[in-house]
Amino acid sequence: MNKDNLVGFFTRIPKFFGRGVNIGRVITLSALSLIFLVCLYYLLGMAVIHKIDDDVDFQPNQSNPGESRTIAMAISLIDREVSKNGWVANDPFFMPGYLLDNMPNYQQGIIYAISRFAMEMTDQIGRSRGSSEVDSDLDKASGLLKYPGTTWIFDLSTSIAPTASSEAQYKSAMRSLISYNKRLGEGTATFDKRADNLQATLRRFAADLGSNSAAISEHLASSGGWGIDSKADNIFYSAKGRLYAYYLLLRELAADFRDVVSGKELSASWNLMLESLKQASRLDPAVIANGQPDGAVVPSHLASLGFYLLRARTQLREIIDILEK
């Protein structure tokens, strides 16, 4: 195509679309259409992805005789949140999950509680009287579960090279827990079901609930009252995730330590503690408001969650006291 033909081609474009076509208007409409499609992509994507999975009747995958039900629950929770529901806390900007905040905080709360349990398994329950060698699978899982939940396959703040994502680390931790539980069923791993081990585990959980309660109280004191609070939902769902995971782990821990629970006549106290955690897990307001704790018009959902949290912690302390006797 020579120069004259090329010029003629471009001069005929307006005639093709009709006389009086405004090229600027076409560009503007195209840009607006693109913006609309991008917004639709994010909004629909967020609606599809978003899920606060707080099923209090959730059951672990079937464990074999001799295996730990609590470990099986930890495995099932990791698998559900990472593989089935999809981990969203580290979604990059071009994915709809990037704009979510409730689900990421909730998922990270769950993983945090599991990591606390894994630490106790490594330090106490997975060893004979705390003096034997640390179990390699438990040690590996405990370390991997501490990995930040917001790391994608690239972390430009540290390096331009690819790195291990949060999902990859948590799946690796899950495989280590599966390996440990399998060896436990085969009789080649330790699960020391002594009362003092249970006591130490409950004490660690209670301490974590205490720090969580302090964070809620501090936030209520500094920003509560008006109901509009952009940080309240982050704190709420992070705490809810922890409490939900603790509820499920403690429910199964009672089965693993059934002889201690029955021998110390803890069943009634244990069930009351579980009920407090269950009530906290079921809190599901459409919008998180942070009004006054005694507000008649604008409630404080953080205060409501904090109430159940403190009650569960108090009941845990009572169980710990009974175990000391």
Where are these regions (language model features)?
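Hydrophobic membrane-insertion alpha-helices, especially the h-region
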Residues: 28-43
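N-terminal Sec/ER secretory leader and immediately downstream segment
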Residues: 54-159
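Long, amphipathic, charge-rich alpha-helical segments that form helical bundles/coiled-coils
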Residues: 137-158, 166-178, 269-294
